[in-house]
Amino acid sequence: MKHFEANFDGLVGPTHNYAGLSFGNVASLSNAALVSNPKAAAKQGLQKAKALADMGIVQGMLAPQERPDLYTLRRIGFSGSDANVLKQAAKEAPILLNACCSASSMWTANAATVSPSADTRDGKLHFTPANLVDKLHRSIEPLTTGRILTATFSDPHYFHHHSHLPEHNSFGDEGAANHTRLCKEYGHAGVELFVYGQEATNPNAPKPQKYPARQTLEASMAVARLHQLEDDNCVFIQQNPDVIDQGVFHNDVIAVGNQNVLFYHEQAFLNTQQKIDEIKRKLDTELYFIEVPTAKVTIQDAVKSYLFNTQIITLASGEMAIIAPTDCQENPAVFAYLNELLTLNTPIKQVLYFDVKQSMQNGGGPACLRLRVAMNEKEITAVNQHTLLNDALFNRLNTWIEKHYRDRLTTQDLADPQLIIESRTALDELSQIMKLGSVYQFQK
């Protein structure tokens, strides 16, 4: 049976804006209050996804969440008509309104952690939505994320969906952005790397001092248990607290893996050699550990360009390609390193550059925009076929974006009651296009 790694990219929602909500995310904070272009953002993401589909990669799309989130605003005491709720919130708590209007669900690397059936005891694909408790604007996502994932991967014979972890900092979980999987072939049992920022229950363990560690060891271990993984399928690695304090808020900002390749910065982890030795013991195949030295690429350049927030994909030829943001081309040190990388003895033979600037300015590169799901042929057949990107769906989504999205949005515009109507109209139509059923609260 054939096996593939599919990418499920998040459609950028109609309220994409720059509110600078993510403390610890340098790009998000430095671009706060810029005027955004939701239409361009959605099209950039869709075009990147379509380019991968055209390369033969199995490519799906995940629907955005309903924003503004009036349900959360009502839970915290704003009342009256929808328009009045927005007006009140804008006047009394503009930062809370901004949080309830964020389009951050576009970064589906944070949607969930996924373990393929080749790794799990029950032979099913497992999904656990991330609770994202560290950031208010993201902590309101998990329930809807779970509904969208269940509507996309709906057959219980193949797919096992878990609830998100308890909503407490001890179980802070940021999903696949802190998880990667190494294997010989996608259909073979692999080793899942769970990267965490701190041990919540051990006050003496290393942790960052300036910015929060969003992922705990306790959360990573809980997900591994839920997914029925054996010890031989797991390696738990602590991210270097010093790089978290330099703006590396998720591991996918400093490392990325694919099949038998782990591409990472030399400062990415604690106890790096010990963990590499553990991976080698647990995965009996030829492995390529590509360590990028600080002398060639500084942490600052890695964060600014998102060198590691790239996708590594395996092409039909068996060679690998890096999907990088154009920001990597524009950074001399990073561009020079990527050109050098292509001359080294590794499976990576191409670098392809994509413009995802609207996402980058909010702190999310190509890897943030996708959730990886390794599947076999039967599992792909069991996926909701209306979520898989082909020419017909691409054209429908492009037309949908053109019809419903604004090309200019400021944080002041978030209080416009018309935005509620526009968003709900768009999402209602999208749920019909993608045959999702009633995944949004306004549809219930």
UniProtKB/Swiss-Prot annotation:
GO molecular function: N-succinylarginine dihydrolase activity
Catalytic activity, as annotated: N(2)-succinyl-L-arginine + 2 H2O + 2 H(+) = N(2)-succinyl-L-ornithine + 2 NH4(+) + CO2
Enzyme Commission number(s) from the entry: 3.5.3.23
SUPFAM superfamilies: Pentein
Cysteine pairings via disulfide bonds: none
Highest taxon of the lineage: Bacteria
Catalytic residues identified in the record: E174, H250, C368 (nucleophile)
Pathway(s) annotated for this protein in UniProt: Amino-acid degradation; L-arginine degradation via AST pathway; L-glutamate and succinate from L-arginine: step 2/5
Enzyme class, spelled out: hydrolase
GO biological process, one term: arginine catabolic process to succinate
Keywords, comma-separated and alphabetical: Arginine metabolism, Hydrolase
Residues the entry annotates as binding substrate: 19-28, 110, 137-138, 214, 252, 362
Functional summary from the UniProt entry: Catalyzes the hydrolysis of N(2)-succinylarginine into N(2)-succinylornithine, ammonia and CO(2).
Family: Belongs to the succinylarginine dihydrolase family.
UniProt subunit comment: Homodimer.
NCBIfam families: arg_catab_astB, PRK13281.1
Protein's name in the database: N-succinylarginine dihydrolase
Organism ancestry: Bacteria, Pseudomonadati, Pseudomonadota, Gammaproteobacteria, Alteromonadales
Gene: astB
